């Protein structure tokens, strides 16, 4: 898939536009915000007739946070965000930044002057790996599975027969004549639906499709907890996949991995120059077998992040 970048003139950051309310800040810091994907990350908005994108990221130990991307030549200084009180959240509205724009957060930490560039933890879309930038996107889609949902809602799921077909989308079927590439979400939908129905399965369980840098992990080392992997298409392509299976009376189960995450430089590890998402005690924050990081479940904001991710996919 070809990703486009904005050609609009981009203005300086404005701080008068925010998607976060006082209640949002309170719930987030308390550990009870379950819909962060509606407030944080990158969201296309229009304010006073001006179209642009609101950026929001949690980095409580940062001295400065700026957005760099394809819209400003990846400049690390021109578009700084502003901290919102004591919430640890940095936010700003950048006029002219549109759908398809690539971006990252440049974080200058209070911790020993540490500087890093990070992908957006709440991004809805990313570049196709091995590239690691986040992509400004929306979730506009017209669903056609109302009949399936109505039927499912009326059924007694506790007593209904259930037969699950587990599948890794990237290896289930490939195209040998095109360098053995995997099928896209839209290509695999009719093939998988037909195969599953012929075999009599009621459900498909997908190995993790959330974005992940290491293909060999089969998705079990997640970096994008709100983004379907770009390896097979866009978020709308994934929605089409789920929609198609629903229309053919196949329920979809998603594997979700809140247990650990990889230490890749663009990801969650050492996010703002401190152990933010992972536990600071290596006995609790590092998985010796997988060489991955373990979430700090005792941190309220981490709980908000993980619960929001779980709710996002429902």
Question: What is the predicted role of each segment?
Answer:
Residues 1-50, 84-166, 171-180, 184-187:
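The feature marks proteins involved in alpha-glucan
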Residues 51-56:
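Structural beta-strand segments of beta-rich domains
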Residues 58-65, 74:
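Short proline/glycine-enriched turn/loop motifs at strand-loop junctions of beta-rich domains
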Residues 65-67, 103:
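Short beta-strand elements bearing conserved aromatic residues within extracellular beta-rich modules
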Residues 76-85:
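Short, surface-exposed loop motifs enriched in S/T, G, D/E and P with embedded aromatic residues
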Residues 150-159, 168-314:
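Substrate-binding/active-site clefts of carbohydrate-active enzymes
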